[in-house]
Every structure is written in structure tokens, then in C-alpha cells.
Amino acid sequence: MSKSNSIFPVLFCAAGIYASFLTWALVQEPLTTQVWENSHKRFQCPNVIAVVQAVAAVCVGYFYMRAKGAQRNYGAIAMVRDYAKPLALISFTQSASSPLSQYALQYVDYLTYMLAKSCKMIPVLLVHLIIYRTTISRKKSVVAVLVSIGVTIFTIGGSKGKISGSISGSNDEHFFQKASGFLLLFLSLFMDGLTNATQDKMLKNNRVQMAIQNAETQDKKQQHKVFHTLTGAHMMFALNFFVAIWNIAYLLVIDRGQICNAHAMLKKDPIIVSYLLAYALCGSLGQCFIFYTLELYGSLVLIMITVTRKMMSMLLSIIVFGKTVNATQWLGIVIVFSGITWEALDKRREKKALEAKVQKSE
């Protein structure tokens, strides 16, 4: 799919991601933190939740493919077969990232965790540059750094006076715990970067292969292999298929107790099922917007939208509920919007220059 020059598709993608994140979070909080009436404990079964989420996303992804007409041109099973190795890698890094960051919270404070997650664009850039040798313009790199700095400042500004006490223990133990936490955060961010950059690379490589194939077809050259158009809907279906497999394997081989615990709680508190299904549905609908954005604009724009979500929610609260932000947070907001505005104006300038060049050639 060609990238649109209009700003409306990216605004549509951003609005869809923000809305789905908001509803998803509203269901996630009671599902995972509430002490249920009959079980007298929280539903702490992350891999069971991940399986339900992945299965729901596979189903929604399949219907998303059919709605786009992608299933007719390139079947879901054929896509899984053709891209099994990279899909298995991406789904593994995607499945491993969240647990690593959650384990890191045992050793670092929540602010450090939030700051690390605010800089997700940087590892994506580094994976593109170092592993895949992708050429990224200096302007796009500067925008990524500006957005990361802005979100970091915004997070620090909103967390003043809210940081809990430090980890107890001797200096050596404290250093070891902090080092362990930072290592886990680094691994989590690396997994995030590898996931997003590899998804991006798969879609871009497919577009190049399709362009070459179309050129060979027009020149009537012999084709050694037939390539099919890979869409965000294909990625959503296939990745969740593998995520489900990874988590089911983990539950069956390593943590069967989680299955027994989930079964016992669902039997005592069947209302959890409705929360679980609502959580899975909201997450699946959100993934439609996420993979649509990835298909149209790539991983850097997608990460830019997701890391600025909290900031956008705060701005909405200011407009609707009259909430206030401090000077430090306003500085972060200005930096983020300066970077985004600079990129938007630069793209508009490039578009006008291209149109003028086309008119001149005619």
C-alpha cells in the first residue's frame, strides 16, 4: 500500500490507537489488580491472558484480512508457511519483552521503568542502523531523539515527589540489584527494537520484491519465485498465531500451575471470563490500528504514536476536565510537538517540491 500524503490517515491511526489503548487499559486494571470476591486473590496468570489475547487477535486478524481482500490474494496459511522463521523470531522477541520489563520492576523504581519505555524509538533506530543497515535520514533520527527527550522530560515532570523508597540492602546488594534491573530493561528494549524493526524490514522487503516482480512481468522475464503482497493484516494474523504457540508451549512445559490456577479462579469467579474476553477484544481491535499504521508509515511513526499516548491523554484531560500540568511537563510537550511539526512541515515542503518538479517535466 502506498503511503498517503494526507495528514488524515495518520490522525485516524493515532486516534484509533489512543482510543483502543484507553479502553484496553480500563479493562486491564480490574482484570489483573482486583481481588476477586470468591477466589480472594488477583488473577495473576499473564501467560493465560496472553494466549486468550493472541487467539482473539488471530480471529480478528483473519476477518481483517478478509475485509481488506488480502486473504484472496495471499492466504493466511501460505503466509505463515513462507515467513515461518522471521515470524517465529518476532513473536518470540515480542513475547519475551514484556516479562523482562516486569521482572526489571523488582530491581528499579517505576520512574526508571517509564523513562526506559519512553525511549523505545531509540532501540528501533539502532536495530535498523546496526543490524539491518537501513539508511535513515538525519532528520528522522533527530525527530526520534527529540520525541524521546520530550517524553522523558514530560515523565520526569509528572513524577516529582512520587518516587517510592529505594531498594533496601547493603551497597553491594543495591548495586547488583540496580545493575540487574538495568540489564533486564536493556534486554526488554532490545527485544522491542528487534520486534518493530524486523516487522518494518519484512514489509519493506516485500514491497521491493513485488516491484521487481511486476517489472519482470512487464518485461516478460522468467520469474524464479512468485511473491505475494504482505499487508499489516497478514502480520497481525501470523504473529499472534506464533505468540499463542510460544505461550501455550511455556504453559505446558514450564508453568502448568498457571493453567490450574486460572481454571480454579474462573470456576469460582466466572465474571472474570467477561473481563478476559473484553480485554482480548479491545486489544485485538487496537492491533488492527497498530498494524495498519505499521503498513502505511513504518515502525518509527508507530512507536512515536504509542510513546506519546500518555501525553495526549494528559492534553485531553486539560481540555475536557481542566487538569493542570507543571512547567517541566509543558517543556516536554513543546519539544515533542516541535519535533513532530518539523517533520510534518518538511514532508509538506518535499511534497510541494516533487509536485513542482512533475509539473515542470510535463
Swiss-Prot record:
Q: Where does this one sit in the cell?
A: Endoplasmic reticulum membrane
Q: How does it sit in the membrane?
A: Multi-pass membrane protein
- InterPro entries per record: SCL35B1-4/HUT1
Q: Which family does it belong to?
A: Belongs to the nucleotide-sugar transporter family. SLC35B subfamily.
Listed A to Z, the keywords are:
Endoplasmic reticulum, Glycoprotein, Membrane, Sugar transport, Transmembrane, Transmembrane helix, Transport
What the protein does comes down to:
May be involved in specific transport of UDP-Gal from the cytosol to the Golgi lumen. Involved in the maintenance of optimal conditions for the folding of secretory pathway proteins in the endoplasmic reticulum.
One Pfam family assigned to this protein is UAA
A Gene Ontology cellular-component term: Golgi membrane
Q: Please list every transmembrane segment annotated in the UniProt record, as residue ranges.
A: 7-27, 45-65, 111-131, 141-161, 175-195, 234-254, 271-291, 296-316, 317-337
Taking the record's annotation, the residue ranges forming a coiled coil are none
This protein's superkingdom? Eukaryota
Q: What's the main place this protein lives?
A: endoplasmic reticulum
In alphabetical order, the GO MF annotations are: UDP-galactose transmembrane transporter activity; UDP-glucose transmembrane transporter activity
Record-given protein name: UDP-galactose transporter homolog 1
| Keyword field contains Transmembrane | yes
Which residues are tagged as glycosylated in the record? Answer: N196
